[in-house]
Amino acid sequence: MITEDKITEIFCMADDFCKFFDAMTAKYTLKPAGKRKYHRSSTMSKAEVMMIMILFHDSGYRCFKHFYLEKVCKHLHHLFPNVVSYNRLVELEREVAVPLTLFIKKVLLGKCTGISFVDSTLLRVCKNQRIHIHKVFKGIAQRGKCSMGWFFGFKLHLICNEKGELLNFMITPGDVDDRKPLEYKAFIEFIQGRLFGDKGYIGKNLFQRLFVDGIQLVTRLKSNMKGALMSVSDKLLLRKRAIIETVNDELKNIAQVEHSRHRCFDNFIVNLLGAIAAYCLFPKKPCINLQRTIDTQLALF
């Protein structure tokens, strides 16, 4: 659980960002042409709602309602004095989807160091036996197949560096090819150097397109890839691809990005963003030690 001092620090970051976001929104948003609709501002600010979502995914609670009523309203009331009812909080979650996304993209993501890892993980929304009666994500989620078999839901595409910091993420339906997000400029805008992936990212056209943008896509070689060579350092770093698998594991088992209790698509997105934000604020992340040790004891002269 995050300490109270850390909660205050994160809240100040989120509050400053929300104030800047509201100022820019008011400056560039078009005025309504029709009759002005009455809109009552909430007693709980956007930064407080964002902070509650981040705290939930780092608290160990499995039920958001129980966490809010028992933890926030009782034990953290001195940090959140303007608490609202649970039903009202669920309504306010939808309003922070865009600010929370930009807060993650502009503030919480790490920086590229020249060594990056890419992978995708599945997000099931129901069991396979319930696909034909599932209604919450009907028309949005799709059937897909991965190394774990068939599933119904979405894919979360991630890029991280050797420090375990997320560099970017993208959410797609389950039937989207893993290589498809790498074709979008916004997904690889701040990526440079070597990008390591599994065999699912092998593609001649994709390699050439990324190489033009200054990205070298490194994957394991297939038996029919004659004439392809790989340096020793690339082979060693390919063995360390488990770092992004560990990131996926922490997102699922600690931050709870995957469960089947969602009741609408809006809250699914906000909970997913809250989990990603919570992971970005973890004090300890999986990392790789890339320090080189020069030892000449075995050198032959």
Which sequence ranges carry the predicted segments?
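Short alpha-helical elements
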Residues: 1-301
